[in-house]
Regions:
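Short, acidic, Ser/Thr-enriched surface-loop or helix-capping motifs
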Residues: 110, 168, 237
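Glycine-rich phosphate-binding loop and adjoining helix at the ATP-binding site
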Residues: 43, 115, 119-222, 338-348
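ATP-binding/phosphotransfer module of carbohydrate and carboxylate kinases, centering on a glycine-rich
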Residues: 1-79, 84-122, 126-153, 260-386
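Short, acidic Gly/Pro/Ser/Thr-rich loop/turn segments
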Residues: 102-104, 165-167, 233
Length: 386
């Protein structure tokens, strides 16, 4: 390039009006959930939005029956009573669905993120098509006790989660080894079967959402979720948003070689998944077919070696997640962690790393929350133009 030649500036990504509208709605909903009861004046201050925008969103929420106004008692005897806004818990409900190869877990959730009902359906050990699973979920949906919900028509959305790589915007499961699926359009199948709007998320990101809600961690608190069990995966929120990556593959780490160019056994999958641990234990004791068998054998040197290897690689990935994300909390979850929790506490670096709740409960709760947030945003969009 010559001295007189001017380098053209790189293009700047401009956020369109649709993005601004979505961001404003999400901001108002987050403040309502975290700070209620809250006045309109406080909403303007906390969101840094204009009074006009706040009024439009709030009026839409009131018209939809999702929030209500209440008078607060003034701190002093003089002065007008402030009008506060509160979330109406029974204004809307969502259903969460978690699909695994051997069972379906569902829940019903109100607008206060309270699980009011849950159910589990065992499955035969065989391959199920998406249509078959959607039909079974419809049966579970229709069999839920009607008296638990103020009005059955208030169930407005379904969140579906499964293990694997998913593309939420396309409603498609790109690949799920556990379910035996590849390029499956799951959202359309469930919507046609049950007749409600459907949102899709993978299991690790659903668990992250569910765990944060259960622990009262607000959206702006950076958090990472490390799943270890049927697979190995990571999900993280950064500045209030779930990290997804270029092709929605953020956190898919189980097949990444620990040493580049080395054989398959150097991937995290070989050292941290439940199936791999059981396979290694069975090579010493063929009667072992679950993790409990390995735990009962910890008085033997080979079992101690398997556990030591597991802890070494778990510590490695925890440090990697901490170094890359530097989150406020790292939550360990998955099917293996609760079973091995007593034996891994010595490798947890500090109080920021905690043991998660039940993996399936967190996942189905997160799926319901994803659907709840999605449908409320859609309902508001129908009511207003910002």
């Amino acid at each position: 390039m010559s001295d007189t030649e001017i380098k053209k500036p790189r293009g700047i990504k401009i956020r369109n009006q649709s993005y601004v509208k979505h961001y404003n709605i999400q901001t108002v909903l987050r403040v309502l959930e975290e700070c209620q009861p809250v006045s309109r004046t406080d909403m303007v201050r906390l969101t840094e939005m204009s009074p006009t925008s706040i009024t439009r969103i709030i009026n839409a929420l009131i018209n939809l029956g999702l929030i209500y106004e209440t008078e607060s008692v003034p701190k002093r005897s003089r002065g007008r009573k402030a009008i506060n806004l509160c979330v109406k818990h029974d204004g809307v409900y969502s259903m969460g669905v978690f699909l695994t190869y051997d069972r379906i877990r569902t829940c019903l959730m109100d607008y206060g993120n309270n699980v009011i009902y849950s159910d589990v359906m065992p499955l035969e050990k065989r391959h199920y098509s998406p249509h078959e699973l959607a039909a079974l979920c419809r049966e579970m949906y229709e069999s839920a006790p009607k008296h638990l919900v103020r009005d059955w028509k208030c169930i407005c959305a379904i969140g579906v989660s499964c293990a694997g790589i998913v593309e939420p915007l396309q409603g498609r499961v790109v690949k799920s080894d556990q379910m035996g699926w590849e390029n499956v359009d799951l959202v359309d199948v469930f919507r046609e079967e049950i007749g409600l709007p459907v949102w899709l998320e993978n299991d690790v990101k659903s668990c992250l959402t569910g765990e944060k809600a259960c622990r009262g961690l607000t959206d702006d608190v950076d958090t990472a979720y490390l799943m270890v069990g049927t697979g190995v995966g990571v999900a993280a929120t950064v500045s209030g948003r779930v990290m997804r990556g270029f092709n929605c593959r953020s956190g898919e780490i189980e097949r990444v070689p620990i040493v580049p160019g080395m054989p398959y056994e150097t991937t995290l999958h070989q050292h941290l998944t439940e199936a791999s641990l059981i396979e290694r234990a069975a090579s010493f004791d063929p009667s072992i077919d679950n993790i409990s068998g390995l735990i009962l054998s910890l008085d033997k040197p080979w079992a101690q070696q398997i556990l030591s290897d597991f802890k070494r690689y778990l510590s490695f990935i925890i440090q990697m997640v901490d170094g890359v994300c530097d989150p406020y909390r790292i939550i360990l979850g998955g099917t293996l962690i609760p079973q091995l929790a007593p034996y891994i506490k010595d490798i947890l670096p500090d109080e920021r790393v905690i043991i998660g709740e039940n993996y399936e409960d967190a996942c189905v709760t997160g799926a319901a929350i994803v659907a709840m947030r999605g449908v409320i945003t859609a309902l508001i969009n129908e009511q207003i133009e910002l």
